[in-house]
Swiss-Prot record:
PROSITE patterns cross-referenced by the UniProt entry: GIY_YIG (PS50164)
Name of this chain's protein: UPF0213 protein OB0043
Gene3D superfamilies noted in UniProt: GIY-YIG endonuclease
Family: Belongs to the UPF0213 family.
Pfam families with a match to the protein in the record: GIY-YIG
GIY-YIG domain location: 3-80
Length: 86
């Protein structure tokens, strides 16, 4: 069975953006919502999923997560907008 890997961007209640990686998107989002996800997202829910990109390779997904995390906010918003247009 091929495992899928995802990079995602969430908008938090305080309008901040959180970028993450997972191999089980539904479960990870549930973890964020219940306060058991990343330390950054605790107390910042509810969340809106703004961006999801699927990978078949964990290494590529993690590289993309790192790349996105290095971007300034306006570049992340452009990335989200571009995906919405596809």
């Amino acid at each position: 069975m091929d495992e899928q890997h995802y990079v995602y961007i969430l908008r938090c209640r305080d309008q901040s953006l959180y970028t993450g990686y997972t191999n089980n998107l539904e479960h990870r989002l549930q973890m964020h919502e219940t306060g058991k996800g990343a330390k950054y997202t605790r107390g910042r829910g509810p969340f809106e999923v703004l961006y999801v990109k699927k990978f078949i390779n964990k290494s590529e997904a993690m590289q993309e997560e790192y790349r996105i995390k290095q971007l300034p906010r306006f570049e992340k918003l452009k990335l989200i907008e571009f995906q919405e247009q596809e």
